[in-house]
Amino acid sequence: MPFLQRTDKKDITIQEILYHQSGLPSWIPFYQEAIDKDSYDGRLFSARKDVHHPVQIGTTTWANPKFKFKSEYISPVKTGDYTVQICDSLWLNRSFRKVIEEKIAEAPLKQKRYVYSDVGFILLGMLVEQLAGMPMEAYLQREFYEPMGLEHTGYLPLRRLCQIGNCPFQQRPFL
């Protein structure tokens, strides 16, 4: 990947990523870059419910719903460069991909041992798109789902599966 060529990640192999032995971090909280840290008091998340964290989003995680997104990255409507759908009323600016690339490039590489890594699979997705010359969802649809006759399997369910009434994740008390 061109954005990794001048980093400590330039020699990571596909095998290392697939085996989760690349040294990449398990995850990177990219979403933090899209949130306006001045829009809420205290911390965004808490281990317990309190006046600032009334919304439970995990077994032991409570959230402050009063935050705002940075308008340079998030829009409530699809318009211009805001083309990446997050949910029915949130659209991400295409420029956020640069933020993701920068965060991956900056993330310190650790010892090459087994650590499950979402970051590796984000990189693999980017690599597939680069090599195929098309978005991941189009590639998967053409090369996997259609040839196998899979009608209820897909990538980016808001674009395809929800149109046929298969949206198990529609309840969103936090977003």
Model-identified regions with their sequence ranges:
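Short, surface-exposed loop or secondary-structure junction motifs
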Residues: 7-175
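Acidic catalytic motifs of isoprenoid enzymes
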Residues: 4
